[in-house]
């Protein structure tokens, strides 16, 4: 395959154009009065959303050089979404600004390697300042405020706060579709563990990369399944019962996985396999929890229990199992209330007698999963397009809330970044001018979110920015109401983790891009664009 290469200014301008096309599409969604973007998915109804990463994911540009720039910027949104679950638009906007300012410094003669050093240093300093300004989430009102700001809806904020009240901050909250028009909260006994399917070939929904099993049997063991013969007797019984099967085992050989996938694809039976969560004694405890919750017999290797002897009545049952890449959620276990209550008392006793903070934390997590259950937010809407959009907003709000619980909250609306900008411009300096130019590329970009929020709300961004620099601590611009308020008191807050990851990821990709001096792409043959005729 032939390649085309562009150097220097030509390469940079093409990459920048791609960066701008993506960022300019995403940034119109920022803030309480941000707009939506309509995405053609190629099937079904279009998706109307203001979720930065969902928009960035759909953008494919015709020019391969511009497309590279867009894809590099998408990495910022994607990484921020993976780690913090929200803040993708802010991250994209910050990255665009840092890249522009970094390239400008290099074009004016600065050494790109030294500018890169300054960008990375400033990114870390801003991140540290955010942690210093952070305050912990203490009340249900804080949770409601974080969720409301993320989803741009007080109603959604209240539902998420209520869900966290019912299953605790460490509980599991999932988002599902409702058959009605109203969005409701339902709490079901269940648990989630941090292991997903062992192969993507088990997936039934390719768009979300998940698999859902309705009323499946559950096999629980800490043994390794080495051959298909180990579980053949129970597989035959499951096929006769005509029920799906979830296998939770310490490990599963490739040969066994291949056989299970082949039979699933052929429609012989519906099965999903996951590895057991945890390790060592903690793994045994967690598997015992799952067995008690589902009503299964835990086939432990320490007790010399043979997998070939498993009977149908040894399997557990759940109303629903949702298996993703990294997590499995069990909803509506058929374990007896007495057995679950007894197990909860055992764990509570262990917490009281434990002297290790690490052990206490692990035990509390297990207790939350057993006692709290799963809260399901059932999203209702009048149309499919509204349902998809609402579901995305709720998922973002949920992620933002979890991030706030982990690292706390800061004043929102972009005000905290402008405050940090003012502080660091006084203290963060470097004797080498090129490194300092890199530092300034980051610091000067910190005002972009506030500027864009104001512009999207119909105000003059520069005027609002000038006024923000005169404000007292924690004061900022409420773009929804068009007035200056105490952001923390009014509940206009951002999760520290979200803002911190946005700046770290933006400075990381910005630092990489400004050191790029050439771009290489494949030259597509004209024949490649002609679709091949089907063979009959």
From Swiss-Prot:
Keyword Protein transport assigned: no
UniProt cross-references to Pfam families, sorted A to Z: Cpn60_TCP1
GO CC term (a single one): cytoplasm
Lineage: superkingdom: Bacteria
MF terms in GO: ATP binding; ATP-dependent protein folding chaperone; isomerase activity; unfolded protein binding
Subcellular location: Cytoplasm
Enzyme nomenclature, EC number: 5.6.1.7
Catalytic activity: ATP + H2O + a folded polypeptide = ADP + phosphate + an unfolded polypeptide
Role description: Together with its co-chaperonin GroES, plays an essential role in assisting protein folding. The GroEL-GroES system forms a nano-cage that allows encapsulation of the non-native substrate proteins and provides a physical environment optimized to promote and accelerate protein folding.
Protein family according to the UniProt entry: Belongs to the chaperonin (HSP60) family.
Binding partners and assembly: Forms a cylinder of 14 subunits composed of two heptameric rings stacked back-to-back. Interacts with the co-chaperonin GroES.
The protein's name: Chaperonin GroEL
Species in which this protein is naturally found: Acholeplasma laidlawii (strain PG-8A)
């Amino acid at each position: 395959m032939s390649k085309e290469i562009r150097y220097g200014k030509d390469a940079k301008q093409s990459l920048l154009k791609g960066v701008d096309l993506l960022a300019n599409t995403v940034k119109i969604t920022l803030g309480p009065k941000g707009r939506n973007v309509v995405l053609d998915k190629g099937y079904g109804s279009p998706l109307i959303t203001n979720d930065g990463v969902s928009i960035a994911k759909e953008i494919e540009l015709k020019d391969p050089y511009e497309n590279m720039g867009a894809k590099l910027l998408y990495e910022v949104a994607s990484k921020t979404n993976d780690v913090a679950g929200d803040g993708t638009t802010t991250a994209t906007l910050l990255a665009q600004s840092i890249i522009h300012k970094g390239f400008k410094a290099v074009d004016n003669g600065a050494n790109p390697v030294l500018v890169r050093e300054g960008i990375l240093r400033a990114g870390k300093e801003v991140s540290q300042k955010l942690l210093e300004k952070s305050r912990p989430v203490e009340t249900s009102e804080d949770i409601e405020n974080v969720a409301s700001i993320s989803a741009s809806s007080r109603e959604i904020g209240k539902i998420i706060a209520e869900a966290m009240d019912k299953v605790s901050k460490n509980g599991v909250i999932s988002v599902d579709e409702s058959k009605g028009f109203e969005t409701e909260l339902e709490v079901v006994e269940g648990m989630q563990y941090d292991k997903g399917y062992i192969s993507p070939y088990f997936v039934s929904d390719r768009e979300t990369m998940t698999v859902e099993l309705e009323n499946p049997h559950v096999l629980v063991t800490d043994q390794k399944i080495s051959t298909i013969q180990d579980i053949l007797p129970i597989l035959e019984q499951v096929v006769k019962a005509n029920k799906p099967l979830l296998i939770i085992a310490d490990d599963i050989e490739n040969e066994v996985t291949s056989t299970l996938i082949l039979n699933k694809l052929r429609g012989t039976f519906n099965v999903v396999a996951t590895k057991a969560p945890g390790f060592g004694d903690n793994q045994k405890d967690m598997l015992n929890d799952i067995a008690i919750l589902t009503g299964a017999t835990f086939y432990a290797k320490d007790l010399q229990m043979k997998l070939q002897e498993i009977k149908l009545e040894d399997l557990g049952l759940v109303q629903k199992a949702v298996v993703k890449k990294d997590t499995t959620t069990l909803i509506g276990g058929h374990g007896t209330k007495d057995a679950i209550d007894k197990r909860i008392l055992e764990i509570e006793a262990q917490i009281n007698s434990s002297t290790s903070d690490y052990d206490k934390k692990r035990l509390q997590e297990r207790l939350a999963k057993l006692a709290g259950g799963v809260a399901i937010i059932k999203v209702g809407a009048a149309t499919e397009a509204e349902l998809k959009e609402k579901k995305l907003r709720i998922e973002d709000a949920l992620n933002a809330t979890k991030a706030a619980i982990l690292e706390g909250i800061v004043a929102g609306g972009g005000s905290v970044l402008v405050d940090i900008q003012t502080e660091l411009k006084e203290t963060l300096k470097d004797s080498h001018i090129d490194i300092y130019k890199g530092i300034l590329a980051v610091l000067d970009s910190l005002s972009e979110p506030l500027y864009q929020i104001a512009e999207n709300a119909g105000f003059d961004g520069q005027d609002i920015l000038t006024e923000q620099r005169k404000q007292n601590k924690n004061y900022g611009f409420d773009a929804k109401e068009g007035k200056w308020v105490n952001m923390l008191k009014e509940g206009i807050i951002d999760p520290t983790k979200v803002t911190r990851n946005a700046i770290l990821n933006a400075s990381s990709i910005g630092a990489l891009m400004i050191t790029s001096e050439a771009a290489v792409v494949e030259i597509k043959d004209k024949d490649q664009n002609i679709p091949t005729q089907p063979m009959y």
